[in-house]
């Protein structure tokens, strides 16, 4: 019995050695060694095998128990046809030949190091030009008048210098040279002190000393009427004034020439309506919003066909833009329909001191059908500075005519009315009394001889002729005073040393009293 147990134990040991030899053979084949048949295999006794031999040395028959009888054959020994020990389950065995490590096959160039070039200069990738690096651009702002007049290089300081100060003029320039030239030209014409350059860190927008604080005018606090509600802890902050520089005569002449010379080539976002003396812009979808704003300030727009997101008019005055948004959401059922803005406007008027009159616009909003652009033609541009007043009178007469035509329309909805802007649209119902009063108030303020910022006899004569055709009457204080001066001069029979002095045709704006069927 004891001999059988020893033989079984020896059989297991031999099977382990056989499996170990087979594993070495498979490793040698994987290594691709060509000396497999020449070199004898040097066997090293592993730690596990030494433990088996030591167990056999101390083996005693009393420690061996009989193996229980198995019901299934072939379960008492290892099957020699099935590999019970795979190479991945064994620790690597060191032999005379270096084993291949799988990591070598994952290295670039099969593990062969590639020497790097010592030359720093390379002609394959030339150095990039430093001109491609974008540097932040600094704008300069000139505040011409007011308590904080000067030249600033930061818009935050400029906005703080202009907020809460009515009548302050300011403009943006790209370089300090342009800003200095504009500031010197203004101070020379006004005969005032030269404006100083105020950097961002040195802007003092508050009194510098206690004495200046005492001499500064006191701040007027708002009087709050409390009816059961708590009074606010502080005064309301002044409204921010958006940066909208006034249009200059040079800007207007540039846009005027652009409209006269535009022939429709190379730009499908706009077309022009050409008349004998002026060309007006018609902007379509995807037009440049900045150009739309400049043309609007110049009074050179006839129609705007904006996109659904109204990106073309995003730089127009906020109240005009809000009126258009309300029209889309409240006045039409299908908010995806295209709309139009039809504008009738005057043009600006300048004097030596600067801008005298801003354009006054009458804007009609409606649902647009298919846009059929007219053919833009390159027109001859021979306008001179002396001709601007005549052109302003012509546009003023057309604006008055379009305003008087509103009286013939019985179904009008007033979307927005301001001092110099009226926005309206067609309505399915009759005009309500509130909208009628708003239109009449706007007509009384605009339809006068002072439409262009100064008393213009040609405008007065045009209003008088137009109103008389409708059976009304129109009177102007300036024209009556002029007639009285002429009559008094003709009645005087005394000697005359020379021609009588003539009054200046440019006077400050004064609203005349009118009486007519359209204008009360």
Swiss-Prot record:
Compartments where located: Host cytoplasm
Keywords of the record, alphabetical order, are: Host cytoplasm, Translation regulation
Gene Ontology cellular-component terms listed: host cell cytoplasm
Q: What else is known?
A: The inclusion bodies are the site of viral DNA synthesis, virion assembly and accumulation in the infected cell.
What family does this belong to?
Belongs to the caulimoviridae viroplasmin family.
Pfam families (UniProt xref): Cauli_VI (PF01693)
Q: Which domain of life is it from?
A: Viruses
Q: What is this protein called?
A: Transactivator/viroplasmin protein
Q: Which GO terms describe its biological process?
A: regulation of translation
| Organism, as annotated | Cauliflower mosaic virus (strain PV147) (CaMV)
Say what the protein does. Enhances the ribosomal termination-reinitiation event leading to the translation of major open reading frames on the polycistronic viral RNAs.
Region annotation (Disordered) ranges: 487-520
Kindly indicate whether the keyword Thylakoid belongs to this entry.
Answer: no
């Amino acid at each position: 019995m004891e001999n059988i147990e020893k033989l079984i134990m020896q059989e297991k040991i031999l099977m382990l050695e056989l499996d170990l030899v087979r594993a070495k053979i498979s490793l040698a084949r994987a290594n691709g060694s060509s000396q497999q048949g020449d070199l004898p295999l040097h066997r090293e006794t592993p730690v596990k095998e030494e433990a088996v031999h030591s167990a056999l040395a101390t083996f005693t028959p009393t420690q061996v128990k009989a193996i229980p009888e198995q019901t299934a054959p072939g379960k008492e020994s290892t099957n020699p046809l099935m590999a019970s020990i795979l190479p991945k389950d064994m620790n690597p065995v060191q032999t005379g030949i270096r084993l291949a490590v799988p990591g070598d096959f994952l290295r670039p160039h099969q593990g062969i190091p590639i020497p790097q070039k010592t030359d720093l200069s390379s002609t394959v990738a030339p150095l990039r030009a430093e001109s491609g690096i974008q540097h932040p651009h600094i704008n300069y702002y000139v505040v011409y008048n007011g308590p904080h007049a000067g030249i600033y290089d930061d818009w935050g300081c400029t906005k703080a210098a202009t907020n809460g100060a009515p009548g302050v003029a300011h403009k943006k320039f790209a370089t300090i040279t342009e800003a200095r030239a504009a500031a010197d030209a203004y101070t020379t014409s006004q005969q005032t002190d030269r404006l100083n350059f105020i950097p961002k860190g040195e802007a003092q927008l508050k009194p510098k000393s206690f004495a200046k604080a005492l001499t500064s005018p006191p701040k007027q606090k708002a009087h709050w009427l409390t009816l059961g509600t708590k009074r606010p802890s502080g005064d309301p902050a002044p409204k921010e004034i958006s940066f909208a520089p006034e249009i200059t005569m040079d800007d207007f002449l540039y846009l005027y020439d652009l409209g006269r010379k535009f022939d429709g080539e190379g730009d499908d976002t706009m077309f022009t309506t050409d008349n004998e003396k002026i060309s007006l812009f018609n902007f379509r979808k995807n037009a440049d919003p900045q150009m739309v704003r400049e043309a609007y300030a110049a009074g050179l727009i006839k129609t705007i066909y904006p996109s659904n997101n109204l990106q073309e008019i995003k730089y127009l005055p906020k109240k005009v833009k809000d009126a258009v948004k309300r029209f889309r959401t409240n006045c039409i059922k299908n908010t995806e329909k295209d709309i139009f803005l039809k504008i009738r406007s005057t043009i600006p008027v300048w004097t030596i001191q600067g801008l005298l009159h801003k354009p006054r616009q009458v804007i009609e909003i409606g649902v647009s059908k298919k846009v059929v652009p007219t053919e833009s033609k390159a027109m001859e541009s021979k306008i001179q500075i002396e001709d601007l007043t005549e052109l302003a009178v012509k546009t003023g007469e057309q604006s008055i005519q379009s305003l008087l035509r509103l009286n013939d329309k019985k179904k009008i909805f007033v979307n927005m009315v301001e001092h110099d802007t009226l926005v309206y649209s067609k309505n399915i119902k009759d005009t309500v009394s509130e909208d009628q009063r708003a239109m009449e108030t706007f007509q009384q303020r605009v339809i006068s001889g002072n439409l262009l910022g100064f008393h213009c006899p040609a405008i007065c004569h045009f209003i008088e002729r137009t109103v008389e055709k409708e059976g009304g009457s129109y009177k102007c204080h300036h024209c009556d005073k002029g007639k009285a001066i002429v009559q008094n001069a003709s009645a005087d029979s005394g000697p005359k040393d020379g021609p009588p002095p003539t009054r200046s045709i440019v006077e400050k704006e004064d609203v005349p009293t009118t009486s007519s069927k359209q204008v009360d």
